[in-house]
Each structure stands twice: as C-alpha cells, then as structure tokens.
C-alpha cells in the first residue's frame, strides 16, 4: 500500500501542483500517508505536511510528532461533542480542500462515510477525489 500511496502523493504534487498536505494521526492509513508525504518532501522540499487536530490545542496539548511541519485545527470544531470530533474534523477538511487521497478497507467504517461525503462534493466540482484500490493480503 505504501508504494501506491507514495506514487499518488507524487502525482498530486506534479500533476495538480499540490503543495500542502493535511493528515490525521489516529490510524494506520494516517501513519502511511504521513510517511509517504515525508518521503516525497525529500524530492519536493517545498511541500508541507500538517497534522489535523480534531481537538482544540488549548484543550488537549499535542507535541508535534515527526515528520509534521505544523498543525491545523479546523474552525468551528469547538462546539462539536468530543465523540464526533474526528469525523467532523475530517468533514471540515473536505470542505476546505481541493484534493483528497482516500483508502477504505471496511465498507461500514467512518472512513467510508467520509469518502461518500467527499464523492458527493466531487460531483459538485468542489473537490477531486482519488480512491486507492483495496490491497488484498
């Protein structure tokens, strides 16, 4: 999966001119995405990698892990109940992003719901969505 993700990150940099990537820090795909962007930065040092914060930084301090350059907290999440914070942070990112690289391995997951939301936005021309194929073990 990592080589495919690396290739897609590089394609977004070259073909779409993407210079800023925002990645969460809560799952295996997030870790792979951060690694793929960090590796792409070796060839494209101008790109940035931001950590998506689902909880307000004043409420929950987060030490910025390597390889992130900075963090991003979406506006308006202060009023979202904590149990919905991660899902809402992802939805808000779709609203302020031009591109999404997604991977869903379980059809009943929150990732699938977020992808469906992004695909509806893509039909309106608001975002370009790339879905990585499921890798069979």
Residue ranges of model-derived segments:
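Acidic/glycine-enriched connector segments
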Residues: 1-137
């Amino acid at each position: 999966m990592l080589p495919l993700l690396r290739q897609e990150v590089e394609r977004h940099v070259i073909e779409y001119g993407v210079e800023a990537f925002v990645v969460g820090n809560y799952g295996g795909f997030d870790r792979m995405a951060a690694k793929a962007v960090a590796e792409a930065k070796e060839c494209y040092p101008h790109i940035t990698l931001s950590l998506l914060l689902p909880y307000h930084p004043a409420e929950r301090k987060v030490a910025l892990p390597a390889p992130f350059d900075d963090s991003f907290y979406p506006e308006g999440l202060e009023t979202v109940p904590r149990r919905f914070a991660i899902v809402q942070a992802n939805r808000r990112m779709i609203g302020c992003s031009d591109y999404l690289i997604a991977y869903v391995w379980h059809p009943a997951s929150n990732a699938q719901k977020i992808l469906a939301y992004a695909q509806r936005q893509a039909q309106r021309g608001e975002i370009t969505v790339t879905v990585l194929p499921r890798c069979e073990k």
